[in-house]
Amino acid sequence: MSIINDTTLRDGEQTPYVAFNTKEKLKIARLLYEAGADELEVGIPAMGKKEQDDLKEILALNLPIPIMSWNRATMGDLDASLKCGLKAVDLSIPVSDILIDIKFGGDKTRLLKQLEEVILQAKKENLFVCIGGEDSSRANNSFLKEIMTLGAELGANRFRYCDTVGILTPHKTYENIKDLSSSNLLDIEMHTHNDFGMATANAIAGYEAGAYSSNTTVIGIGERAGNASFEQVLMSLRLLGKEININSKALKSLIKTVSSASHRRVDTNLPIVGKNIFSHESGIHVNGMMKSKNAYEPFNPEELGLKRSFPIGKHSGSSTLIYHLKSIGIEPNIQIVQKLLPKIREIVTNRKKVLSTNELKE
């Protein structure tokens, strides 16, 4: 089984220049659930009263999925989560030598003792505990297994494998997660960053290697270059055989809401949700699409509330012109159509813009 634990309201909001208000958070949380998220990570209680109040309002929505907070592995952060009434927590701890040196003076014994104390307290409160392995991709797997073994003994439920600085490749991800998952210590959750454009690919490689869950953010917002995209991971899980019922209305509203609230434009060619990703210009492709809608599309655009189109551009062929002429009631003459193509290519090249059907008619 594979699930999505979306962190748009936590790591997504850590995008520079992004700040969601309470109303936006509530709408995003509800739409994430409706669009198919299995769990939500919704904030950092230790930030203070306003954040805690927002988290309480999200909990008051009574969404039928787990709601999690992000915390440092400290008693103070845990107490802040408990005050909100949360039942699931991520307890973040550095696991790479470089961050352990910076945050714990290289003292792994002190780190493990602190982690143990906080996990014990969290389990005493009957919380779901995810151990967040900060900078896992620069850590030694043997140390990660030591942490996972300790966590399992203390009753922790999950280990979050964080590619904190976004340096993983899909191949390396698969190797590392396969090694960790084969130990059968804790369920593994992927947390990938997009610094080299591989966040979604790495999340999928993690699933393939045995990871149970992955963090995502809507349209891939997040620290620096962002995180694995919710919509991309959601649809990619179908490639792995997961049954997914797409709520296209909720997904479309979710994308629009997050784009507006974060002031992030949705590129027209953004995978899964860009409005032009089902636009076919190449003459060879259009000819194939006229014969079968499966020729050059990975899934039906209507599933996501999108539409296919056949713009009249530089690379258009006779099939495109015939399609558009017929759409306005003109029975095309193939010889005339073929003579039009060079002229259309010249016009489009000069003005850097496709022709409309009405312009073709003229």
What would you call each of these model-derived segments?
Residues 66, 160, 213-216:
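Short hydrophobic alpha-helical runs that function as membrane-insertion/retention elements
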Residues 69, 135-143, 193-198:
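Active-site glycine- and acidic-residue-rich loops that bind
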Residues 2, 244-362:
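A mid-to-C-terminal "edge-of-domain" accessory segment
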Residues 2-4, 11-40, 57-61, 75-188, ...:
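Alpha/beta enzyme core
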Residues 100, 163, 216-222, 235-244, ...:
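Short beta-alpha connecting loops at secondary-structure transitions
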Residues 168, 174-291:
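Catalytic alpha/beta core domains of metabolic enzymes, predominantly
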Residues 46-63, 69, 74-79:
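N-terminal active-site wall of soluble small-molecule enzyme domains
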